[in-house]
Design a protein with these regions (language model features):
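Short active-site loop at a secondary-structure junction
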Residues: 88-93, 403-412, 436-441, 464-484, ...
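Active-site SXXK
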Residues: 103, 249, 318, 378, ...
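Mid-domain, small-residue-enriched loop/turn segments at the edges of structured enzyme/sensor domains
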Residues: 513-518, 550-588
Length: 778
């Protein structure tokens, strides 16, 4: 008897004879027995086919999620993250109730009632499918955990049976809260994020406790289909799913009508990627390389947390300073024209596709947005960025590119419909035409006492150029090397008061057999003290000084500061910066003057912890310093410091003291021949910082550009933050120095053993006065 005929017979049962009813009962009993037998056979087949192939169960009982490498500042700001899966493991007790309720409402409302498989849910889903009512998947949270950890998404009977068996095993081994904890930390939620804590940071830049009801509902709607309901990729579908979650929460009594309506109406700002709290891509890459060298493949999955020595506020100040002043330089040297051009089709859909394809090749650079021009006139430009919005640029926002808007502009300069331009927005929401700079820059700051990095910016844009100019760029230092030659001269009896002749100098060794004639930017001044010569960066005096102490001696002396002797020629051009240094070398070298004569080794990592916060490595405290560890005499460091302070107070670095209004700033500008490189290296207190600007392929930065116009503004902008609230640093003279002729000198060089003049004719009258002063002990 078929199932259909049996059903008909059952409906006719009240009208049947007693004999017929007995026959029907026997038939139904037999059918029931067949069903039971079939179920036993099915269960048996399941046990035979599924149980032997069940995967190892410790993956959930001993859960070890893949947690990425994370890098932080010393004050806990996230700098970078490396790993295939973005995940923050969060214990169930720290997950806010609103998020748990939103998730269970849409995924498994009877989670705390069933035993892993919700048969009522299966029937309800079937009825809903047939009736067109609210559709809820038949898979429970526990079944999804089984699928996520053990199985694929293939649609086979065996896979589904295995999922059911695993669900029961999971329920028997783990508590409900533990199962939910596994699910909420493991589930994929789009944008390479796994788990709700990571998704909250990625989409809303928030921690879980900070989520609103609307945001929690948005996240809870993602698991069913992360591609379809990704709010960053499909905002309309994600919104519809969010409203479904809120409707379900209302039906279950988890929220009130007022809460529902408020959440539905809340406008959400959706992020597209993980947001970091400080701009330090080059730092993050340095740390990644160091960790990978030690831990290899485990680097990106074991949840290492690396705390650097950086300060968040100072790092962001350094980043902003580099970006601001590179763009300022670029503005000074004019608009070069659009980055590219694309023909825009008349068809709207084809036009949008053309814009999207084009802008994919021109990614944004922080506040420099790439956009395709859709409308242009001399007074207004409209452009479309990757977001699909329309930017309107007018008034002062067009000034930088005014020549490119003229009707007779050259084709490679002209802005027209289809041009790819860069735009930036000011604090008042006004857009301006800008451009990606060709020049690059770098900045590094360290603690003079222990070498700890305070800030590091390896270049203008890490996504465009991963090369770390701080640690890897060997560039000519220009005049910023001069203080080290002066330091060497102090050991030979010179002092800041030593008079030298700032007059034309002709030496053999020039190009094409011609004499070499070093020059000053500001002409010649005749007899001048070394203090004045350094303050005004006199090239001829620096050459005469090196000539007096000998290039080989000076080159050997430079090694005390950490310079590589092989990269500095043992000839007179060395004093003008013809050798090669990195910005990091310059920072550690200037730290010797700042800390009284000790060489420091730069260090970046303060400590490393595992995912549970256990300390794996901690930087040892710096050992107490001993005088015998000095690389230069304390007196030498003190005197050079006094000279470098004068450079900043009234010399080539005077802009710093004027803008920062401090008397404890010390440093030196540096400009190479033809202004190929611009430098400023200096310090205040225990903060040592070096700024550099130049092209990767060396070429002139411009005829009227110097270290003071290129690098010094970066240094000033950073120091404004780094020195905020810090007292003025005073230096006390160490034992063994005296004031002679109005300036400091080593005690052993107070008399005739010191160098009073060099290449300067002393008048007879001055000789008489000197003799009288000496006779009376002056």
């Amino acid at each position: 008897m078929s199932f259909f005929s049996t059903a008909v017979s059952f409906l006719a049962l009240p009208f049947a004879t007693a004999s017929y009813r007995n026959d029907l009962r026997r038939t139904l009993l037999a059918l029931g027995a067949d069903i039971v037998l079939a179920l036993f056979v099915l269960v048996g087949a399941t046990l035979v086919t599924v149980l032997p192939s069940l995967p190892a169960f410790d993956v959930v009982t001993d859960y070890r999620p893949k947690i990425p490498l994370r890098i932080y500042t010393a004050d806990g700001a996230l700098l970078g993250e490396f790993g295939d899966e973005h995940r923050d493991f969060t214990p169930i007790g720290e997950i806010p109730p609103v998020l748990k309720e939103a998730l269970l409402a849409i995924e498994d409302a009877r989670f705390y009632e069933h035993s892993g498989v919700d048969y009522r849910g299966v029937l309800r889903a079937l009825v809903a499918d047939l009736s067109g009512g609210f559709r809820q998947g038949a898979s429970t949270i526990t079944m999804q955990v089984a699928r996520t950890f053990f199985l694929s998404r293939e649609k086979t009977v065996k896979r589904k049976l295995t999922e059911v068996v695993l669900a029961y095993r999971i329920e028997s081994a783990l508590s409900k809260d533990r199962i939910l904890e596994l699910y909420m930390n493991q589930i994929y939620l789009g944008q390479r994020t796994h788990g709700f804590a990571s998704a909250a940071r990625t989409y809303f830049n928030k921690r879980l406790p900070e989520l609103t009801l609307a945001e929690a509902a948005m996240l809870a709607g993602i698991p069913q289909n992360p591609a379809k309901h990704n709010p960053a990729v499909n905002p309309l579908r994600a919104k519809a799913r969010q409203e479904l979650v809120l409707k379900r929460m209302l039906q279950l009594g988890k929220i009130t009508q007022a809460q529902h309506d408020e959440a539905v109406g809340q406008a959400l700002t959706i992020g597209h990627r993980l947001q970091f709290e400080a701009h330090a891509d080059h730092v993050a890459e340095l740390v990644r390389q160091e960790l990978h060298a030690q831990y290899q493949g485990d680097t990106y999955t074991r949840g290492f947390n690396v705390y650097t020595t950086l300060d968040k506020a100072e790092q962001n100040a350094a980043y902003d300073a580099v970006r601001r002043n590179v763009l300022a330089y670029d503005q000074r040297h004019g608009y070069r024209g659009p980055e590219a051009f694309v023909e825009l089709p008349d068809n709207a859909e084809e036009r949008d596709e053309a814009i999207e394809r084009t802008l994919a090749r021109h990614p944004g650079s922080d506040n420099l947005i790439a956009a395709v021009v859709t409308e242009v006139s001399a007074k207004r430009v409209r452009a479309e960025p990757a977001s699909g919005d329309t930017l309107e640029i007018k008034g002062d926002g067009l000034r930088f590119a005014a020549r490119a808007l003229q009707a007779n502009a050259k084709m490679d300069l002209k802005i027209r419909v289809g041009s790819v331009v860069r735009a930036s927005q000011d604090g008042k929401g006004r857009w301006s035409i800008s451009q990606m700079p060709e020049v690059d820059a770098a900045f590094v700051a360290i603690n003079a006492e222990d070498g700890a990095y305070r800030a590091l910016v390896g270049g203008f844009d890490f996504s465009r150029n991963q090369f770390n100019h701080v640690t890897r760029a060997w560039r000519q230092p220009g005049s910023s090397i001069k203080p080290f030659v002066y330091s060497a001269a102090l050991e030979k009896g010179f002092s800041p008061a030593t008079l030298m002749n700032d007059a034309p100098l002709s030496l053999p060794g020039g190009a094409d057999g011609q004499p070499w004639e070093p020059r000053n930017d500001d002409g010649f001044d005749g007899p001048i003290s070394l203090r004045e010569a350094l303050a005004r960066s006199k090239n001829v005096i620096a050459v005469r000084l090196l000539q007096a102490i000998s290039p080989p001696y000076a080159r050997d002396y430079l090694q005390r500061f950490g310079f590589d002797a092989a990269k500095h020629p043992a000839n007179l051009t060395m004093t003008l910066g013809s050798g090669s240094v990195t910005p990091l070398q310059m920072a550690t070298a200037y730290a010797v003057f700042a800390n009284g004569g000790f060489k420091v080794s730069p260090r970046l990592i303060e400590k490393i912890t595992d995912a549970r916060g256990n300390v794996l490595w901690q930087a040892p405290p710096p050992p107490p310093r001993q005088d015998e560890q000095r690389v230069i005499d304390a007196r030498n460091a003190f005197i050079i410091d006094s000279m470098l302070r004068e450079v900043v107070s009234r010399g080539t670095g005077a802009q710093a003291s004027q803008r920062l209004a401090r008397s404890d700033l010390a440093g030196k500008t540096g400009t190479t021949s033809d202004a190929v490189d611009g430098w400023f290296a200096g310090y205040a207190g225990n903060v040592v910082a070096v700024a550099w600007m130049g092209h990767d392929q060396p070429k002139s930065l411009g005829g009227r550009e110097f270290g003071a116009t290129l690098a010094l503004p970066i240094w000033i902008d950073y120091m404004r933050q780094a020195l905020s609230g810090k007292p003025i640093s005073e230096r006390k003279p160490p034992p063994g120095v005296s004031v002679v002729d109005g300036d400091w000198v080593y005690d052993e060089f107070k008399g005739d053993d010191g160098v009073k003049t060099l290449d300067v004719e002393v008048s007879p009258l001055k000789s008489i006065f000197d003799a009288i002063r000496k006779a009376f002990g002056g």
